[in-house]
Amino acid sequence: MHLVDTHVHINFDVFAADLDQLQHRWRQAGVVQLVHSCVKPQEFDQIQSLADRFPELFFAVGLHPLDAEDWQDNTAGQILAYAKADDRVVAIGEMGLDFFKADNRDHQIEVFRAQLAIARELNKPVIIHCRDAAQTMRQVLTDFQAESGPVAGVMHCWGGTPEETQWFLDLGFYISFSGTVTFKKAEGIQASAQMVPPDRLLVETDCPFLAPVPQRGKRNEPAFVRHVAEAIAALRHVPLETLAQQTTTNARNLFKLPVPA
């Protein structure tokens, strides 16, 4: 059984002491490929070094909405240059909108649209962070696609209702679920995980955050994506192997990941 963890942050300091053991555990859990997200372009060299160390690691480059104030006149050029510099860059992101306690919504939208344009130019998918912003996100994506054409991508660590989920499915996006789908009170997320079409479903950890049950409260890590897959398989009443195969195929289709030899 093979799994792809489509969203990790193993460059964070919390992993520095045991990266080799981390790899051993994710391989034991069946994880054969990972997509490393990027919070800001300055992380690029560090993430690239991790991909040199771990051949199953692919990565993105972009600016997180919580860091939107760091956007400078040269940031778009940096992202473009980094994305062109390495074939292992499979996406632009993570980008998006985070309106939880935000007082810079208009600026976040500007930065988000700028990164959508980069992805469109490079024909790469986007990794989207959306928190407390689903309606605005829907409008921004709808407007951008009407103006510039379709952009592929994934709504990562998805926490929306089934109605909101359908909005982004209709826009052509994949939906990725994290450890939150295992939480007892996450009925809305669980309902969304049940209704996503099989060919648009992805799994992730978003490690080191949001460890799934039964590891909740611990540092999250890529091996725990198996718990996410098990929970979604149970919700959808399908064998784990079926869900693993489908989500792995989906990840490779979206991110154009090679099939390991």
Curated annotation (Swiss-Prot):
List the GO cellular component terms: cytosol
Which residues participate in a divalent metal cation 2 binding? 94, 129, 156
Which enzyme type, at the first EC level? hydrolase
Q: What is this protein called?
A: D-aminoacyl-tRNA deacylase
**Entry keywords, A to Z:** Cobalt, Hydrolase, Manganese, Metal-binding, Nickel, Zinc
Q: Which cofactor does it need?
A: Zn(2+); Co(2+); Mn(2+); Ni(2+)
What's the catalysed reaction? a D-aminoacyl-tRNA + H2O = a tRNA + a D-alpha-amino acid + H(+); D-tyrosyl-tRNA(Tyr) + H2O = D-tyrosine + tRNA(Tyr)
Report the InterPro entries cross-referenced here: Deacylase_DTD3, DNase_TatD-rel_CS, Metal_Hydrolase, TatD-like, TatD/YcfH-like
Instruction: Relate the protein's function as given in its record.
Output: Catalyzes the hydrolysis of D-tyrosyl-tRNA(Tyr).
Please describe what happens when the gene is knocked out: Disruption of the gene increases sensitivity of the cell to D-tyrosine.
Traced from the root, the source organism's taxonomic lineage reads: Bacteria, Bacillati, Cyanobacteriota, Cyanophyceae, Synechococcales
Cofactor: binding details: The enzyme activity depends on the nature of the second cofactor. Enzyme containing simultaneously Zn(2+) and either Co(2+), Ni(2+) or Mn(2+) exhibits high activity. Enzyme containing two Zn(2+) is poorly active.
Gene behind this protein: dtd3
